[in-house]
Structures are given as C-alpha cells and as structure tokens.
C-alpha cells in the first residue's frame, strides 16, 4: 500500500519523529565536533549539508522500518552506522571511519534489497559520509 494512499497512522508519524530526532541529534553533535582536517566544502555550506544528510538518513530509516519492521537486519546496520557516525565524529580514528563507511554501504545494499526508495533516500547520506571521512582519514591530502 502506498503511504500517500493510506490513512495517516499516528504510529508511523511518531516513528518518523523518532528517526528524525535520532539522526538530527547525531548530526548536531557531528557538526560541532572538532575537525582534525578541514572538510573540502565552503564553511557556509556545511551546516545545511549536514542537516540535509541526516534528515534524509532519518527518512530512509523510517521508510525501511515501514517495510521491514524494527527487528530487521537492515535497521540493525542502520543503527550501527548511525552510532559509528557519532563515535567517529567524537574520536576520528581511521579504523572507525572505515567501519562507519562499510556499515553505511552495507545499509545501502540492505535497504536496496528491501525498499528501493529508502535506498535512494539514503544514498546522499552515504556519499556525504564518504566525502567527509576520506580527507579526515588521510586517504587524500588537501594542500
């Protein structure tokens, strides 16, 4: 059943609010955490990009939850990548960044198998995480 064709379910809206709260809370911490290497983005663009990325991440998690439920393998990876994202921003170690990126890619693949719209919605967040983490992990240097 299409979400737009169905009656609004208060449970779904509460779940969406929780996904948004969790993702945007991690995003808020991530945006103010110390950056050991400058992100190659104009400073004025960082806050809107973080907000958009984590907002899309929340919507993708919610879409996947609607399809597969809370106890799914895909949402386990989603929660793990969100937790790794928070921990990596507080302690940007290369191994944590690699684990975060691998977990985000696994989440993308699992979402694609279960809910294509969730995967497409999650893709910008994966690209943003890769874009931000690669220079911080020293995969390339900015001079």
Residue ranges and their predicted role:
Residues 6-21:
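N-terminal membrane topogenic signal
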Residues 133-143:
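Juxtamembrane boundary at the C-terminal end of a transmembrane helix
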Residues 3-9, 94-98:
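Short amphipathic, positively biased membrane-proximal segments
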């Amino acid at each position: 059943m299409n979400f737009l064709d169905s009656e609004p379910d208060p449970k779904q809206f509460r779940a969406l609010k929780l996904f948004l709260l969790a993702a945007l809370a991690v995003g808020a911490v991530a945006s103010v955490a110390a950056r050991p290497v400058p992100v190659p983005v104009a400073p004025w663009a960082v806050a809107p990009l973080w907000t958009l990325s984590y907002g899309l991440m929340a919507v993708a998690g919610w879409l996947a939850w609607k399809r597969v439920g809370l106890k799914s393998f895909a949402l386990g990876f989603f929660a793990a990548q969100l937790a790794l994202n928070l921990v990596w921003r507080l302690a940007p170690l290369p191994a944590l960044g690699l684990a975060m990126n691998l977990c985000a890619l696994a989440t993308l693949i699992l979402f694609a198998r279960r809910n294509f719209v969730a995967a497409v919605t999650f893709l910008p967040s994966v690209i943003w995480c890769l874009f931000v983490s690669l220079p911080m992990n020293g995969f390339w240097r900015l001079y």
